[in-house]
Amino acid sequence: MSNRDTLFSTPVANLGDWTFDERVAEVFPDMIQRSVPGYANIISMIGMLAERFVQEDSQVYDLGCSLGAATLSVRRNIKASGCRIIAVDNSPAMVERCRRHIDAFRADTPVEVIEADIRRVPIENASLVVLNFTLQFLRPEERQQLLNTIWQGLKPGGALVLSEKFSFNDADVGELLFNMHHDFKRANGYSELEISQKRSMLENVMLTDSVETHKQRLKLAGFQHAELWFQCFNFGSLVALKAGHA
């Protein structure tokens, strides 16, 4: 059972930029369920995608794994044998807790949890790569290179799951979905103070792209097929496929 997120329920004098530190890791499951609409659905459906795409004797990468929710969903649903999951995060607090979460569940598929910069991790023999609300924390000029690396490391017939918060070219649509997201957070018990303080901390470190921009990058990386498979307000997930057969 995770602790309830009350990190920003009182005024913070010097907010600074957002970091995934010990305090955030401690309340992260509650925070993300109450902040990201559709998160639980995305996690469970990543497991369904894993059942379809993970190939025999291949590797799965969960880049920006946080506490390992996507990794556990993948591991529960893998039917192929001889696979290995590599879960990567650059937050020591997240990695420590992720290892504990993974170790709490028995399964045949081994998981290696690595504390590292996802931009420096080689992608090899991969049949599935998960980027779950991670790319948006890289500088925009670094995003294409990571997608290129992922495509190069994927086996033919492999897939990338890319979940992100989106911006919108249509300002009216963007404003509506932005407001709906805030309604969602209010309905989940967050106060105006909590919402505004968190937004202030995130605005310099989480820079969102439109779905169109994501699709353009994926095409440039080499993915011949990429489409939005899930969306709730201004959050969603794309699946990108590498051509060929396993």
Swiss-Prot record:
Alphabetically sorted, this entry's keywords are:
S-adenosyl-L-methionine, Transferase
Q: Which residues bind S-adenosyl-L-methionine?
A: Y39, G64, C65, S66, D89, N90, D117, I118, N132, R199
**Pfam families recorded:** Methyltransf_25
Biological process, per Gene Ontology: tRNA wobble uridine modification
Q: Which reaction does it catalyse?
A: prephenate + S-adenosyl-L-methionine = carboxy-S-adenosyl-L-methionine + 3-phenylpyruvate + H2O
SUPFAM superfamilies according to UniProt: S-adenosyl-L-methionine-dependent methyltransferases (SSF53335)
Q: Which domain of life does the protein's organism represent? A: Bacteria
GO molecular function terms listed in the Swiss-Prot or TrEMBL record = carboxyl- or carbamoyltransferase activity; S-adenosyl-L-methionine binding
The record's EC number reads: 2.1.3.-
Looking up InterPro entries in the UniProt record yields: CmoA, Methyltransf_25, SAM-dependent_MTases_sf
Binding partners and assembly? Homodimer.
**Family assignment from sequence similarity:** Belongs to the class I-like SAM-binding methyltransferase superfamily. Cx-SAM synthase family.
User: What's this protein's function?
Assistant: Catalyzes the conversion of S-adenosyl-L-methionine (SAM) to carboxy-S-adenosyl-L-methionine (Cx-SAM).
Q: What is this protein called?
A: Carboxy-S-adenosyl-L-methionine synthase
Source organism of the structure: Erwinia tasmaniensis (strain DSM 17950 / CFBP 7177 / CIP 109463 / NCPPB 4357 / Et1/99)
